[in-house]
Amino acid sequence: MKTSMQSKLDQLTTRLAELNDLLSRENVTADLDQYRKLTREHAEIGPVVEHYAQWRQARADELAAQELLADASMRDFAEDELRGARERMSRLAAELQTMLLPKDPNDERNIFVEIRAGTGGDESALFAGDLLRMYLRYAERQRWQVEMMSESPSDLGGYKEVIVRIAGYGAYSRLKFESGGHRVQRVPATETQGRIHTSACTVAVMPEADEIGEVEINPADLRIDTFRASGAGGQHINKTDSAVRVTHIPTGIVVECQDDRSQHKNKDRALKVLAARIKDKQYHEQHAKEAATRKSLIGSGDRSERIRTYNFPQGRMTDHRINLTLYKLEQIMDGDLDELIAALVSEHQAELLASLGDAE
């Protein structure tokens, strides 16, 4: 283990002891905000310090085994102990290196998932509905909460555009790699000749701002229009102007919400989505310079980048960023995303490790 890494782990061990002391004080537990902040930090570094304690124990076992090597009668036993200790040290050091990787500050946040139909007309809108169901089924498996924020249904089913809010611990860390272009190859229900069509949708996964105030929005920069909510085919749902359209003039970002009968609730939802979109735009602009110097295969989140193909006749899903093909399309479309997400997270961690190595 590198000296710099060991020094960092020693600092975290000291910090954990400080946190244990602070969290036992009444004045700290009385301040809810401070208590929440400290418990979050404790939860983050606790597993790292525990791993480091195991590594130090393995190193102590290694030293003890080396001393036993001098005794001829204990040599076979000592060699087995030495080999086992070194294997544990190597495994724990690799795991610690991954645990010390820079954390994305948005990882534990709730998210907004925005799905837009692209090329392919009605078939693209139907596939947008299939993607929404896939994410909702995954959220259900994680016991996350889902709230419909905005929807624009298509005439034949599916969606021209749909936005949902998914609330759950670590939602962004699990689904952030879904941003990009999703292509589908299948025979549409309306196809009489049995020909395979190709269509596409774009997905944007945006972390929710903790508070709308976290993103600076000048009320003077907003244009808010109200109109009558309508469903698929244009039929009016109610007689009042309950639907809300919010335009952020400096960026040109437009958000519409009409799912609730209350204009106030629709406006509140629209402002939340707007804050997330502005935050997302700032995040990608900030990382554009880094992307220019170091091509990030996984985490770019570029909406125009085709990241995945779903081939229904062959029952396969291919993620083009990591050249991963899985022949379990039915399960994937039913929300079984764990294998795919684990592969993407692993590749992203490998990229981070490589970039840290280059920096050193």
From Swiss-Prot:
Post-translational events: Methylated by PrmC. Methylation increases the termination efficiency of RF1.
SUPFAM superfamilies per the UniProt record, alphabetical: Release factor (SSF75620)
GO CC aspect terms: cytoplasm
Location of this chain's protein in the cell: Cytoplasm
GO MF annotation: an example: translation release factor activity, codon specific
Keyword terms, alphabetized: Cytoplasm, Methylation, Protein biosynthesis
Keyword Membrane: no
Sites of N5-methylglutamine modification: Q235
Main function: Peptide chain release factor 1 directs the termination of translation in response to the peptide chain termination codons UAG and UAA.
HAMAP family: Rel_fac_1
NCBIfam families in the cross-refs: prfA, PRK00591.1
Family classification: Belongs to the prokaryotic/mitochondrial release factor family.
Name of the protein in its database record: Peptide chain release factor 1
Organism this protein belongs to: Burkholderia thailandensis (strain ATCC 700388 / DSM 13276 / CCUG 48851 / CIP 106301 / E264)
